[in-house]
Curated annotation (Swiss-Prot):
One MF annotation (Gene Ontology) recorded for this entry: succinylglutamate-semialdehyde dehydrogenase activity
Pathway annotation from the record: Amino-acid degradation; L-arginine degradation via AST pathway; L-glutamate and succinate from L-arginine: step 4/5
Binding, NAD(+): 221-226
Species, as recorded: Ectopseudomonas mendocina (strain ymp)
Annotated EC: 1.2.1.71
Record's function text: Catalyzes the NAD-dependent reduction of succinylglutamate semialdehyde into succinylglutamate.
The protein's name: N-succinylglutamate 5-semialdehyde dehydrogenase
Reaction catalysis annotation: N-succinyl-L-glutamate 5-semialdehyde + NAD(+) + H2O = N-succinyl-L-glutamate + NADH + 2 H(+)
Catalytic residues of the enzyme: 244, 278
Disulfide partners: none
HAMAP family: Aldedh_AstD (MF_01174)
Pfam families for this protein: Aldedh
Length: 487
């Protein structure tokens, strides 16, 4: 099978065998072989060879290619959505929204480039001060499995717009989505070598991340891998590194008037995408007492009735599967570990079929657990912590090395202002689901959640570097010379 796209040609892989599976049926969706180190080298050289012409291409010319890419995505939307559903397990309705986000990223990136990294000038004494931006050169993009189209697209589109050439290494769990996306770029007329696709697992990733021919790496994925990349790039100020690594996100519930509105927002925050969004709520902070008890009882009732099913099931499920049987097993083990440490199951997460990666929502009260792990349990497992006062709830919310998202459900603006002031997160929401974000806002966090603001409006900032110039069309002698100089 032709697995990789290098220098404008589809090539079979020379590395380890690779296949993606439908996480529910375990049917093979895609198969091939990963890229070898030699093929990584070939792809880097192809990108390096294409860079000068692509960077010299006019901005309008690059925009035209991007807009044709958006048109290709629209024309293949159903095929892409089905591939996303097949490989990730997310319901078709949700997969379709991901394709829409991919399309919209083009216009957003163009607007962002013009506003944040376009050309600006102004008079300065007898010269003109000009700010322009240049592409870094050849950059690697490592994509995640949870949004295999949208999230790598959020790096690739602004990188190409800025004039970079790209080496795209998708998750080894979602190669089909990556292949279809690259075919849309080909349909758009992207020149050979400007975008190269390298499928593969660890072997391919290590070879690409360590290649001396790349000028930077843009990564969305696990904290573990992101930390390894950060250590690898330490001491290399000549290379740009952008990381988005998820979080252990808190959602505080104040005593609100509308319990059902709170429950619905919690469900959307914790269990959308089967809990496989980096901004999903992992910790729910609920006040002690009768009102908090009533909220949790209603939450357990609603969460226990959520429809879970295969991606193309009709009527459509709210939740699909997690990405793999291995991921399901790890989540079930995480629940068992928390229960062994003293947690109480308000709603036990279950795996109805041993041979399918479908999990039902889990809600555990971990208030009594003295040493709660500061980990991102990437699935439908929500931890509840009861609090006695609002100051204590904010302090508890901040007890994490991560800092991606935090939220508050409250009828009090004063409490939200207090929460916003003291929250340690890059995304802070009030009375909105934690997974919600504006496309024109930066996306990312602080601490162990990463650096820069990956794959969103501020992606333009790390896809090009600023060049400041003082310019004058004529070389003239100043009327007053510097003291000590005689001409």
């Amino acid at each position: 099978m032709s697995t990789h796209y290098i220098a404008g040609q589809w090539r079979p892989g020379q590395g380890a065998p690779l296949q993606s599976l439908d996480p529910v049926s375990q049917a093979v969706v895609w198969q091939g072989q990963g890229a070898s180190a030699a093929q990584v080298d070939e792809a880097v050289n192809a990108a390096r060879g294409a860079f000068s012409l692509w960077a010299a291409h006019s901005l309008d010319g690059r925009i035209a290619v991007l807009e044709r890419f958006a048109a290709a995505l629209k024309s293949h939307a159903d095929e892409l959505a089905r591939a996303i559903g097949e490989e990730t397990g997310k319901p078709l309705w949700e997969a379709a929204t991901e394709v829409t986000s991919m399309v919209n990223k083009v216009a957003i990136s163009i607007q962002s480039y013009r506003e944040r990294t376009g050309e600006k000038s102004g008079p300065l004494a007898d010269a003109t001060a000009v700010l322009r931006h240049k592409p870094h050169g050849v950059v690697a993009v490592f994509g995640p499995y949870n949004f295999p189209g949208h999230l790598p697209n959020g790096h690739i589109v602004p990188a190409l717009l800025a004039g970079n050439c790209v080496l795209f290494k998708p998750s080894e769990l979602t190669p089909k989505v990556a292949e279809l996306t690259v075919k849309c770029w080909i349909e758009a007329g992207l020149p050979a070598g400007v975008l190269n696709l390298l499928q593969g697992g660890r072997e391919t990733g290590v070879a690409l991340a360590g290649h001396p021919g790349i000028d930077g790496l843009f990564f969305t994925g696990s904290s573990r891998t992101g930390n390894l990349l950060h250590a690898q790039f330490a001491g290399r100020p000549d290379k740009i590194l952008a990381l988005e690594m998820g979080g252990n996100n808190p959602l505080i519930v104040d005593q609100v008037a509308d319990i059902d509105a709170a429950v619905y927002t919690i469900v959307q925050s914790a269990f959308i995408s089967a809990g496989q969004r980096c901004t999903c709520a992992r910790r729910l902070l609920v006040p002690q007492g009768q009102w908090g008890d009533a909220l949790l009882a209603r939450l357990v009732q609603v969460a226990g009735q959520l429809k879970v099913g295969r991606f193309d099931e009709q009527p459509a499920p709210f939740m699909g599967s997690v990405i793999s049987l291995q991921a399901a097993a790890q989540l079930m083990q995480a629940q068992a570990d928390l229960l062994a440490k003293g947690a109480t199951a308000l709603l036990a997460m279950t795996q109805p079929q041993a041979d399918a990666a479908l999990l039902t929502p889990g809600i555990l009260d971990v208030t009594a657990v003295s040493e709660r792990p500061d980990e991102e349990f990437f699935g439908p497992l929500l931890q509840v912590i009861r609090y006695s006062d609002f100051d204590g709830a904010i302090a508890e919310a901040n007890t994490t090395a991560f800092g991606l998202a935090a939220g508050l459900l409250s009828d009090s603006k004063a409490r939200y202002e207090q929460f916003w002031l003291h929250s340690r997160a890059g995304i802070v929401n009030w009375n909105k689901q934690l997974t919600g974000a504006a496309s024109t806002a930066p996306f990312g966090g602080i601490g162990a959640s990463g650096n820069h603001r990956a794959s969103a409006y501020y992606a333009a900032d790390y896809c090009a570097y600023p060049v400041a110039s003082l310019e004058s069309e004529a070389l003239t002698l100043p009327t007053t010379l510097t003291p000590g100089v005689t001409l």
